[in-house]
Amino acid sequence: MIRVMTDNAANLPPELREQYGIRELCLTYTVNGVPADMSAPFDGYAYYEAMRKGAEVKTSMISPLTAREAMEPVLEQGDDVLYIGLSGGVSGTCWGVSVVAQELRERYPHRDIRVLDSRGASLGEGLVVLEAAHLAQQGADMDTIIARASELCGKMRQLFVVDDLKFLRKGGRLSGAAALAGTLLQIKPILEGDPEGKIVVHSKERGRKKAMEQLIRLYQELVEDKSRPVGISHAAAPAEALHLATELRQAGCTGEILSVCHEPVTGAHVGPGMLALYFYSASWR
């Protein structure tokens, strides 16, 4: 049996993880120096409101011990492991898990242990994980699952609108001068995950409304199959997420739309008010 694992950056709701038997490993974070309780449900409103008021958030990768303690019991039971993780373009988590996986291969030479960098975050990662877990439940072999997941990673589009440029500046994404100018001019950058899974600026729009309209235009322009699943994540902006879902339906989307509050790990770098859209285009990376 193949056990699919991922991290909390994949933004998958508990009920979906349970349905597909997905094990979640946690990147951790602190708010004003206080460690978050990773066993408690994530209160997105409180988290992003704290950020809006100036709270300092720091995030940490999955520890080697956490990865080892998650994988080893599965291997001891005679099962194989596929870990699909947060983009190596924004985190060293996949690299760290890969190191642990290599150690475990030496201890369990008859088990198949794979690590796949999704080059995504939130549902840009999570939608791929769901597809892989579905294939595992159907009895597909590891090579088949890896091939399909890799193909989907190469098709995934991840487009973000941020509300305040200061969080990008703090994360080193923009210079202080550019962030100040953007704020004064009400410029709302649309970000995307590039071929390496790094966050880059796709385009810039004057005002929030025009930026959201551009998300829909990009969906219509780039989507490969409008019946495929689509993801939406928001950083405490549920009304806008609902509006985006409505606009997607009007644009012809017939696939399932999964909408979630954006997880705290990458949310720390894009800030409150962020709105993101995830969908499959033709293969591009």
Where are these regions (language model features)?
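A glycine-rich beta-strand to alpha-helix segment
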Residues: 85, 114-115
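Short loop/turn motifs at secondary-structure junctions
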Residues: 1, 77-80, 253
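Mixed-charge interfacial surface used for oligomerization/domain docking
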Residues: 3, 9-23, 28-30, 90-93, ...
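N-terminal glycine-rich anion-binding loop in soluble enzyme alpha/beta folds
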Residues: 3-66
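Glycine-rich phosphate- or other oxyanion-binding loops that anchor nucleotides, phosphorylated ligands
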Residues: 52-99, 142, 146
